[in-house]
Amino acid sequence: PNQLPIHSVPLLSDRHIDYTPLEQLLAQQDFQAADRMTLQKMCELAGPDAVQRKWLYFTEVENFPITDLQTINTLWLLHSEGKFGFSVQREIWLSTGKNWDKFWLKIGWKTGNTWTRYPNEFTWDLSAPRGHIPLSNQLRGVRVI
């Protein structure tokens, strides 16, 4: 795969978060590590309590600066040939008429009535369905999209 030059996206943050580690993992197409890094950066955005517990409350996500969410999303889009990112997930969710069950099936988080198990049953490369990752909004029922 063609690696895009690092820093082809301005890494903007309203909360002085450094997105370079995420950019590097995505540039290497190490999507599993990038997914974990995405959650880590989102916990940093939420503050020290979230960093300690390593997951997010729905209410914390509501207060995220749009600048940071756009930076994370743009990095995912750019390094996945447009397949992965919050905006892709949102587009698919809207295309299902905001039906969560259809959405989860479409992006491969569920097969029939069975949830895809983390991490081994997820597909961590570009052969995954569109919108398959990042998983951050699956964890603890957090919806970023």
Task: List each model region and its residues.
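Surface-exposed peri-terminal alpha-helical interaction modules
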Residues: Q3-I145
